Regions:
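Short hydrophobic beta-strand element within catalytic cores of glycosyltransferases
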Residues: 316-320
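Nucleotide-activated donor-binding/catalytic signature segment of Leloir-type glycosyltransferases, i.e.
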Residues: 260-279
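Glycosyltransferase donor-sugar binding loop
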Residues: 37-43, 183, 216, 245-261
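Aromatic "clamp/platform" in nucleotide-sugar-dependent glycosyltransferases that forms part
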Residues: 280, 299
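A conserved mid-protein helix/loop that constitutes part of the nucleotide-sugar donor-binding site
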Residues: 17-22, 211, 215-237, 260, ...
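Donor nucleotide-sugar binding/catalytic pocket of nucleotide-sugar-dependent glycosyltransferases
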Residues: 56-57, 149-167, 171-195
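Short His-centered aromatic/hydrophobic patch
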Residues: 104-110, 128
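A short, well-ordered alpha-helix in the C-terminal region of glycosyltransferases
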Residues: 345, 352, 359-374, 380-386
């Protein structure tokens, strides 16, 4: 294979985008020539550009115009002509007709894939990180249908994800590969560096005997930020006499309406000194490496990177069943899996771990071991390169 075209939806610091970044680094190490098309920018853009050329999809000149202006332009066919010119310019810049293989990262990227008119002979690999909720939020049915119809091989991050695309979208299971890319050596190094940094909670004024229950992820309903606060209320209420007060820290909540709503709940629940919302930061591991328990409150998460980060920090995970692929890794020895949205059960398991330090250590260490056993980075990249070679030879 000579040239690989990668398509991503943006460069925000989130799970799928970080996986793509790690993938690009490993592919570059294999000498693969790449170009990346992004639907939008973000904090990771410079890191992407350090690996390969990056093209941001251009916006229409009149995209910010008033609705009436757009309607008039549409009737005159101006926008349609602009779109055609833009598509052709992007195709020429990417030299689409000479690309050997296309890798589409996330179904959201199907929007830009559909505008490129990729030649029928070019194999397409789609790396899916989304389940039902995210598919409905971040993709359109016709764009997803087109993407899946052109997909030669589907990379699914978990069994739950593979099952969803097979049974809800009729994708051929013989063309689905279970694939999770975690750059475990780099992540282990980053964890080590984070642990060597000064205790960030001391600078926040936490008591030295505090136990930290952590959450991490974007601020959105799907991630269960609201459930995290309810969980904190239950745990604190059931553990009033503890000599080790539990503090709840969620990393990844930016300023905005949702943050304001969450802070209102926190204040009204009397938890202002126990629940702490941290904005998105590249220093996630400084917080996570000192968590005592990680709770995945997501209503849906296919196979989130944060669970791998927690595991390599030797932090046990408590998550919901039927909310994605995390139970496949956590199982019965890396933490606890509780019934979907059962916060009573989740709070009981969290308290169990907080009260039993040896159990915390045993489960956290075992979770880290399973990650290293099941997801070695070298094997993962070799699997992908072999797949690329097979598809480009057909």
């Amino acid at each position: 294979m000579k040239t690989l075209l990668l398509i991503g939806h943006d460069a925000n610091r989130a799970g799928a985008q970080l996986v793509l970044l790690n993938l690009m680094r490993l592919l570059k190490g294999k000498g693969i020539d790449m170009h990346l098309l992004l639907g939008g920018g973000g904090p990771l853009l410079d890191e992407y550009r350090a690996i390969c050329p990056v093209l941001l999809w251009p916006t229409l000149e009149h995209a910010a115009g008033a609705g009436l202006t757009k309607k008039v332009l549409g009737k005159l066919g101006v926008q349609k002509r602009q779109l055609a010119i833009r598509q052709q310019a992007v195709r020429e810049q990417l030299n689409v007709d000479s690309v050997d293989l296309v890798l589409v990262n996330t179904v959201s990227s199907g929007h830009w894939f559909g505008q490129l008119a990729i030649p029928a002979k070019t194999p397409v690999v789609t790396f899916v990180h989304e389940l039902d909720m995210s598919v409905r939020i971040y993709s359109k049915p016709d764009e997803l249908a087109h993407l899946l119809s052109r997909t030669s091989e589907l990379l699914a991050v978990s069994k739950a994800t593979a099952h969803y695309y097979e049974h809800q979208h009729g994708f051929d299971p013989n063309r689905i590969t279970l694939y999770t890319l975690i750059d475990t050596p780099s992540l282990e190094r980053n964890v080590k560096v984070a642990r060597e940094q000064p205790n960030i909670y001391a600078s926040m004024g936490f008591p030295t005997n505090a136990l930290i229950v952590g959450g991490c992820g974007n601020a959105e309903w799907r991630k269960g930020n609201d459930l995290f606060i309810t969980l904190a209320r239950q745990v604190v209420g059931r553990d009033m006499n503890s000599t080790h007060p539990a503090h709840f820290v969620w990393v990844g909540v930016p300023p905005g309406t949702l943050r304001d709503d969450l802070l209102l709940d926190i204040r009204k629940a009397g938890l202002a000194d126990r629940v702490h919302l941290i904005p998105p930061t590249p220093d996630v591991l400084r917080y996570m490496s000192r968590f005592d328990v990680f709770v995945l409150c997501s209503r849906e998460d296919p196979y989130p990177l944060v669970v791998f980060e927690a595991g390599l920090c030797h932090v046990p995970v408590v998550c919901f069943a039927d909310a994605g692929g995390s139970p496949e890794l956590v199982e019965e020895d890396g933490g606890f899996v509780v019934p979907y949205l059962d916060l009573d059960a989740m709070s009981s398991r969290v308290l169990n771990l907080l009260h039993k330090p040896e159990l915390r250590q045993t489960m956290g260490k075992r979770l880290g071991q399973k990650i290293l056993e099941r997801h070695p980075a070298k094997q993962s990249i070799e699997t992908l390169v072999t797949l690329f070679d097979k598809l480009t030879r057909q």
